[in-house]
């Protein structure tokens, strides 16, 4: 963010509304390509003048408004070899530059929001693992859950209209509209339930998707706050609603005294808990499935009439949390009942007390993970380790370092698992696959090569957590072992490992 403010020197009150002139700045495209500001981003040429990039971008935008933007003159191909290599390359350049520009108002608004709310260590909230402590704290007290796929609208105009609430520059919005209509077919790839954006232009379309999600969640949050039963709200705006609850209570006492609590909960909405991940969302509530059905039709109506995205109510399943497992972000999460029997004795009388407590558990699903390892040629489909083909010039240390890095990354990501058995199996597969790879390279048997490496090789596959705990508790091995078996969540994980992403 400091880099943006240093380059653009934007005034937060006015100047960031006029984004169109920034399209003709050299450093915009340098930032988009993560290049230095002293290097050309269109093609490598020591004598290339920075002012030429502005001329090129102006020509590209002008031809976008023409009837056939893919026709180039001979002079353009001779003077600028950039035009002659790929006819669709300039659409990628403009989209990347435009993505950097439209992110500026959102970035400034995010920074000002964090400063205003005084959120300490806000970078921890970006971690994938930050979701799971929230689930541990909340989900053990809930009863019903729905795992919902968030639909994405197909019509291009809705994407532009959504941005109108955030970007006030009409010229930029007109350019975006022309760009999307001209190159929509070449920039997206239809797949299954959602439109996946091509790898050539991920930044712009990720921005459009996130702006769509931001609009949807802002409306959803408003509905959620309005329908909650005001446990933590004391605002004068809701006095009428509170008075309505008082009348309900009086009505229930007079006519339905026996079922007073049930009648009152029928009118009052419990607090809705919401989690979003990878284009999906989790909704969870306490008490009755009737309220989950009501929220289901809220969402279907919102998607169909506000975002014009067709969605069938039958695709939203309502499940009991104690009988359902959530598979997301490489974990299988569920709420289990743990019963504990306590024997109590008072004088001569003794009796047993059976306590049932709900506990949120996260485990590593071994079958999908073995499938990912099989696709990467670490094992076969049954989970038996195999040798991985390597380059002839790869040294033994390079091969070992690669396997160690994969093993430690997986262990680091799955450190929050409440059961480590699946993780031990994955480490065994990677360790034996490494030995088989080295034995294949040196044309020896696995047994002979393993004797040559010795026990020190096996110790290298210890994860960072095991090494640190062994240093803290060098004498009490059982203590460090017990601590390692517990759940550890890290707030520095911002991306999913390719082997963990089963989507």
Swiss-Prot record:
* GO annotation, biological process: mRNA processing; RNA splicing; tRNA processing
List keywords of the entry alphabetically.
Chloroplast, mRNA processing, Plastid, RNA-binding, tRNA processing
Transcription regulation in keyword set: no
Report the GO molecular function annotations. RNA binding
InterPro entries referenced in this protein's UniProt entry, alphabetically:
Domain_X (IPR024937), Maturase_MatK (IPR002866), Maturase_MatK_N (IPR024942)
One Pfam family this chain carries? Intron_maturas2
Gene Ontology cellular component terms for the protein in this record? chloroplast
Cellular location(s) = Plastid, Chloroplast
Work out whether the entry's keyword set contains Plastid. Answer: yes
Q: To which protein family does this belong?
A: Belongs to the intron maturase 2 family. MatK subfamily.
Functional note: Usually encoded in the trnK tRNA gene intron. Probably assists in splicing its own and other chloroplast group II introns.
The protein's name is: Maturase K
Q: Which organism is it from?
A: Syzygium anisatum (Aniseed myrtle)
Which lineage is the organism of this entry classified under, starting from the top rank?
Answer: Eukaryota, Viridiplantae, Streptophyta, Embryophyta, Tracheophyta
What gene makes this protein?
matK
